[in-house]
Regions:
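Short linear motifs at protein or domain termini
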Residues: 1-107, 209-219
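Short beta-strand-centered segments that line the small-molecule binding cleft or hinge
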Residues: 174
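Alpha-helix boundary recognition
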Residues: 27, 61, 156-159, 190
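Conserved amphipathic alpha-helical segments that form helical-bundle/coiled-coil interaction surfaces
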Residues: 107-169, 178-187, 196-206
């Protein structure tokens, strides 16, 4: 077998492009929560074959951005307060452990520091792309810093719903306040204070969950 040209590996497939396009529309709210998404509608809108549409939709199901039961039409999830509580419960179990491990090593990821700066900058442009994506990028940078492929896969399985949840209520994201909380997490990691790092992360996620639940109840 001849060697594979590395450039070929970086070229996105049609499924990749389609997946990204639909994902962006869902997160921006162009495809509203509760809306149905069918292979036929996607194939027609994007002028692609139905197998291509199906493959893209299957990825979105894995991402948590579509839900589909057996023989049922796929729909954009409409998350309720119990979904949010369970999501943040799961995230806290993972992320508290992550920052405690990082604190043991006094390992502050460079990428995480960049996200804190980017989040402060996003205060002037509070959009889904500028704020929510940066916010979640910070969290993921901590997870990836431990270099565990299985942990990353586990975490990524939650991130689609987390992104959707925040995108549906992104107006409540207090970027300056959240950036300050992130700075305290990184300071605790740098100091090697395992307890403080864990407590700061738990407190951050608990407050975020409470804000989201309160927002959902009010609306």
């Amino acid at each position: 077998m001849s060697p594979v040209d590395q450039n070929e590996l970086s070229v996105p497939s049609l499924v990749d492009v389609l997946h990204a396009a639909i994902r962006d529309r869902i997160l921006k709210g162009d495809i509203e929560p509760g809306a149905s998404v069918t292979e036929m509608s996607i194939a027609t809108q994007y002028s692609v074959a139905r197998p291509t549409a199906k493959a893209a939709m299957e990825r979105l199901v894995v991402d948590g951005l579509l839900r589909r039961s057996t023989n049922k039409t796929a729909r954009v999830p409409l998350l309720d307060t119990e979904d949010v509580r369970d999501l943040y419960f799961s995230r806290e179990l993972i992320e508290r452990s992550v920052v405690e491990r990082l604190a043991m090593k006094r390992l502050v990821p460079d990428e995480a520091e960049k996200y804190v700066t980017a989040l402060r900058d996003a205060a002037d442009e509070p959009t889904v792309t500028a704020a929510v994506s940066v916010d979640l990028g910070f969290h993921r940078s901590l997870v990836t810093a431990l270099n565990s492929p299985r942990l990353i896969r586990l975490y990524d399985g939650l991130m689609g719903e987390a992104h959707l949840c925040m995108a549906q209520a992104y107006g409540i994201l207090q970027t300056e306040r959240v950036a300050d909380e992130y700075s305290r997490i990184l300071e605790a990691i740098e100091a090697g204070d395992v307890q403080a790092a864990g407590d700061e992360m738990s407190g951050h996620l608990d407050r975020a969950c409470l804000r989201l639940v309160s927002h959902m109840r009010a609306n």
